[in-house]
Amino acid sequence: GPWPYTMVDGDYPDYTWAEYQSLPDYEKYNRALSEICEEVEANNIDYFISVHSNAATEGTTTNYPLFLYKGDDARSSANYIEGNWEKCNACWNYRNEIMTSGIDPSSSYKDKTNLRGCDNFYGYTLGVLKHSVSGYLVEGYFHTYQPARHRALNPDYCHMEGLAYYRGIVDYYGADKENVGYILGTVKDLNNK
């Protein structure tokens, strides 16, 4: 949904669907998948990533990343685009590192990857991947796991998730790595701000 989220009376509101659609930035952040695909095709893009959150039953403790690419798990179908799996794999360790560190605990896939072809996972290609550019959709966490949803409301946490994808992209292209670090964590004491 629209980001950055705005607090109302010190809390983040739970919008009804109608209220959500009436937000000023709704159209900006909720474009048709066909529009996104047209933009990808028209702009000579060489790396596509679509960042999302996943859903299960509200209040669940299910929480893990899922990378989905066009094609099949065996990377042998005519639908597969060369480089899809490799791009996912380059980012997996960095994204999964956030979860295995305990900052955003993972309920599954701690010791193995979760990189899947849409053809096997869903039986069809997701609308946002119906273009001819190599890349993937990533479900970084489950927003129905309440701690993950609240972390996603924090711009610093979103920056950290973005850094994970950035580092994977740098690895994929073999580019020079950054030479600075980031100190990230959580404060669990009301007296320390």
Residue ranges and their predicted role:
Residues 186-193:
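Structural motif
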Residues 1-180:
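Active-site-proximal helix/loop segments of hydrolytic enzymes
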